[in-house]
Amino acid sequence: KVLSDIGLRVLGIERKEICNNLRHYMKNMLMHSYLSYMVLDPEDPILAREGNEYHPRIEELIQSYSDFAQKFNLPIKTHHELVDIEGAKDDFLLSVRDGEGRTSCLKAKRVVLATGSYDEPNLAGIPGELNGSVQHYFHEWEHISDQRVLFMGGGFSSADGIVALCPRNTILWVVRKSKDAVDEMLHLQKTKWGQHDARLVNTEILTESQVVSLEDNTAVVQTPDGQKTWNYDLCYMLIGHRPAQDLYTRLLNGNLEFDEETFESCERPGLYLVGALAKKHLEHIGLTHNLCPDNEGVRYIDNIRSAMMQEFNCSGQ
């Protein structure tokens, strides 16, 4: 939208649906940032109805972004996956594969990579972590009950997942953090992040601990007091994600460094890294006047806009 507004001919390519990364999470999960930090349309109806300090659910944010694309008739090819990029600045040739496996080619002068960082889960390098009972995304969960569920990872994804599951299941949460750090996070979950009714029941927390094996649906946990074992039915290993390694090895020799002012790739001029690839997340892309404090008063999409205006001598609108 921003680049179209300065007169550039722009095409978006999305390998699945719009907001594919967000669809990996449970649709009722509350976002920790305010909607006004993330919303694209200043006239967004949810923002108008709920106000600047509203914590949206995942499904509401997906709807907001989908409505934005439709409202401005953004040219986005869904179910098209970027396979490779040949050529150089001003003369790129993109290989794209559609949902039926057919490959086509597109020409471009510049390429903005905004593929996110959730393609591949981080692994712990322990036995059993690739078992079918080990999940790396917290998505479908409403049907889970009367199970022994192990959570690995000390972030809010684990905390949110445990709050959702603990009323009907038995939970073990293994974290490397200290007890004070976990208590602080749970306090923030109930206060700053809007989940005022969050409550842990049926949950044991092992702090300053780590799982060393998941084989045969038995977790072996190294704790400050020695090793413990815990049989589980389902494990959520929520220790982060990373970009598709194969793709960025091909495109950028695995080098994700970029110019902080323009976001242009250091490895391959003409390619730009934005969003989670540049470690600038949803709250850094909003187009309203309500800027997230964490982004130091800068709307990062403006850097891309300024760089492109200079490259193509655009005046903007």
What is each PLM-predicted segment?
Residues 1-25, 170-182:
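Glycine-rich FAD pyrophosphate-binding loop
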Residues 13, 17-63, 278-284:
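Glycine-rich active-site loop/strand segments that organize a redox cofactor
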Residues 27-29, 249-273, 277-283:
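FAD-binding beta-loop-beta segment adjacent to the flavin cofactor pocket
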Residues 46-67, 77-78, 178-192, 285-289:
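Short beta-strand to alpha-helix junction loop
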Residues 57, 104, 113-171, 256-268, ...:
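Glycine-rich dinucleotide-binding loop and its adjacent helix/turn
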Residues 73, 77-80, 84, 91, ...:
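A Rossmann-like FAD-binding core segment of flavoenzymes
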Residues 104-118, 150-152, 230-241, 273:
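Short hydrophobic core segments
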Residues 269, 273-317:
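A conserved FAD-binding loop/helix module that cradles the flavin
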